């Protein structure tokens, strides 16, 4: 692909992708959107440069297996392809039919490999056939939790408008200017050789942005794949660079330098001192430091109590994310919507706010309560069996 894109464009796109504060921030954690972004960019280039049908289909199948929102990308790319096909005039039906006949085998192979790839994961290697039915069903029956509705311009505000928060400036304006420069050249009178590719990605970005802006459920990580496409599009600002005027060359070089430097500075803030701070625009409902410290603390507790086990660990209530991720190294962890009768026998208990009072009463004689913060505005109560707590206090009285 580097040979097709051009060395300079590929290098700039890679730098913008690697330095993007949005992508850097969410690459630090397990979240489906980063896999979707990886497979999505691969699928986009496979479509653009007509990779073998099986490779293209596999990339799309991996997107399907990762997240149901892959249909937005598939629709955007299909629409972009159709618009480019019809950009000069409406082709005759005979041309469309001939085009279909020419590519029908490739289309069938790509569709088959996409479905087989997705089915492999959704059916647990074809052992649970119903999984594929549920995968298709979720596209049409989609529920979201409350509190995430945002206005139409949420993503424009997040990326295009400079905002000062937490002592740092947050903006993606230089990158958007580079992408706009690439579009102006591609749609202009002297387009570069990669003009059709640039137009395809530009239309894709606009359709992705429109789709995600119309959907009321919004958060930063949903923009990972569209923003990755913006980074690639911005890289194409260097396409046909040698044929540009001196003023245009100076503009592109200056904006590219500003984009790379400012993105790097924002990324350092995003994953540094503001990693779990709600003033970081990418730290959406961030996890509190209390919970980030929980796993290492529990492991220390296990070390100083070799004759006892800190498992099973019980989590009581709903809305407990990211506890499953934090407690992933503890195999014997259970989740209950309501406190079970044998709760007092469990060494470690975490209770969500709606059950904290009831659990505190049930464990009053056996456990030490320790208030903690889970996410912004969401407390959680940690209960530790008293003998374990006494061991810890003797080990570390601070």
Regions found by a protein language model. Give the residues of each.
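Transmembrane alpha-helical segments
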Residues: 1-4, 39-47, 75-82, 179-183, ...
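Short acidic/glycine- and proline-prone juxtamembrane loop motifs at membrane-interface regions
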Residues: 22, 28-33, 69, 219
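Transmembrane-lumen/periplasm boundary regions of multi-pass, lipid-linked membrane glycan transferases
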Residues: 25, 58, 64-198, 206-216, ...
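Short periplasmic/luminal acceptor-recognition loop of GT-C membrane glycosyltransferases, typified by
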Residues: 56, 284-285, 289-335, 339-341, ...
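Hydrophobic alpha-helical membrane segments of integral membrane proteins
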Residues: 35-36, 55, 72-73, 222-226
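Transmembrane-helix signature of polytopic, membrane-embedded enzymes
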Residues: 1-19, 51-55
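Specific aromatic-rich, kink-prone transmembrane helix
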Residues: 16, 25, 35-52, 59, ...
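Aromatic/acidic, Gly/Pro-rich catalytic loop(s) in extracytoplasmic/lumenal soluble domains
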Residues: 344-398
């Amino acid at each position: 692909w580097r040979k097709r894109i051009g060395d300079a464009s590929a290098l700039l796109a890679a730098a913008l992708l690697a330095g993007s504060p949005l992508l850097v921030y969410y690459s630090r954690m397990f979240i489906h959107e980063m896999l979707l972004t990886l497979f999505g960019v691969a699928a986009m280039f496979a479509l653009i440069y007509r990779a073998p049908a099986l490779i293209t289909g596999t990339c799309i199948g991996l997107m399907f297996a990762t997240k149901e929102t892959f249909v937005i990308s598939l629709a955007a790319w299909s629409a972009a392809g159709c618009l480019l096909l019809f950009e000069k005039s409406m082709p005759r039906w005979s041309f469309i039919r001939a085009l279909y006949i020419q590519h029908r085998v490739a289309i069938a192979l790509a569709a088959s490999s996409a479905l087989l790839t997705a089915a492999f994961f959704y059916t647990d290697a074809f052992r649970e056939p119903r999984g594929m039915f549920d995968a298709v069903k979720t596209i049409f029956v989609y529920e979201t939790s409350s509190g995430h509705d945002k206005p139409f311009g949420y993503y424009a505000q997040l990326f295009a408008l400079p905002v000062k928060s937490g002592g740092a400036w947050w903006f993606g304006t230089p990158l958007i200017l580079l992408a706009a420069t690439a579009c102006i050249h591609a749609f202009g009178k002297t387009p570069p050789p990669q003009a059709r590719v640039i137009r395809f990605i530009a239309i894709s970005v606009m359709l992705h942005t429109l789709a995600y802006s119309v959907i009321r459920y919004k958060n930063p990580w949903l923009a990972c794949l569209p923003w990755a496409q913006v980074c690639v599009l911005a890289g194409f600002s260097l396409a046909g660079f040698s044929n540009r005027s001196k003023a245009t060359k100076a503009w592109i070089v200056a904006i590219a330098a500003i984009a790379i430097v400012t993105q790097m500075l924002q990324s350092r803030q995003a994953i540094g001192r503001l990693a779990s701070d709600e003033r970081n625009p990418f730290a959406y409902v961030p996890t509190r430091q209390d919970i980030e410290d929980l796993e290492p603390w529990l492991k220390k507790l296990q070390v100083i109590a070799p004759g006892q086990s800190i498992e099973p660990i019980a989590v009581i209530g709903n809305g407990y994310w990211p506890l499953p991720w934090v407690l992933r190294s503890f195999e014997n962890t259970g989740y209950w919507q309501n406190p079970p009768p044998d709760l007092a026998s469990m060494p470690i208990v975490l209770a969500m706010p709606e059950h904290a009072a009831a659990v505190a009463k049930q464990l009053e004689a056996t456990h030490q309560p320790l208030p903690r913060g889970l996410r912004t505005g969401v407390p959680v109560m940690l209960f530790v069996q008293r003998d374990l707590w006494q061991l810890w206090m003797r080990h570390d009285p601070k």
